[in-house]
Amino acid sequence: PPGPSKTIADVGCGYGPIGLAIGKASPHHQITMLDINNRALALAEMNKTKNQVDNVTIMESDCLSAVNHQCFDYILTNPPIRAGKDIVHRIFEQAFDRLKTTGELYVVIQKKQGMPSAKKKIEELFGNVEIIAKSKGYYILKSIKG
């Protein structure tokens, strides 16, 4: 997003495609990339170095537990569906707690991998959810904390 510096969390960052792309394109924003998988974190660090992205912090974290003292303007996630619905829903719950007022949650999810139940859970938490894009079975959901 353009404008003043924002804080952005990429939850379940994997090897880093989302967080690093945003960090590279928007060097004035502060990106925190979180994952519980050590291999994913090592690859994210390697990609951060290779792409010379300086405004990104990469941390080991179970959902958002490592940043429970911090609030964000934006939280992005392509949740680890294979980890199970409980973990995915915990990401949404912790995202609600860690977002600033008027903060935004963005979720990338496949319809066949739980989009309807994810959408329902997000709507229960946030009171709103919008499908802002869909293509080839993938959906991007957006919610605003109000």
Model-inferred region functions:
Residues 1-77:
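Conserved SAM/SAH cofactor-binding pocket of Class I
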Residues 22, 95, 122:
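Class I S-adenosylmethionine-dependent transferase superfamily signal
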Residues 35-38, 87, 110:
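Short beta->alpha hinge that forms the Motif I/post-I loop of the SAM-binding pocket
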Residues 77-86:
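Glycine-rich phosphate-binding "P-loop"
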Residues 90-101:
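A short glycine-rich, Lys/Arg-flanked "PGG" loop and its adjoining helix->strand segment in the class I
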Residues 102-109:
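Conserved beta-strand signature within the Rossmann-like core of class I S-adenosyl-L-methionine
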Residues 110-125:
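Conserved class I S-adenosyl-L-methionine
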Residues 134-146:
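Core SAM-dependent methyltransferase catalytic element
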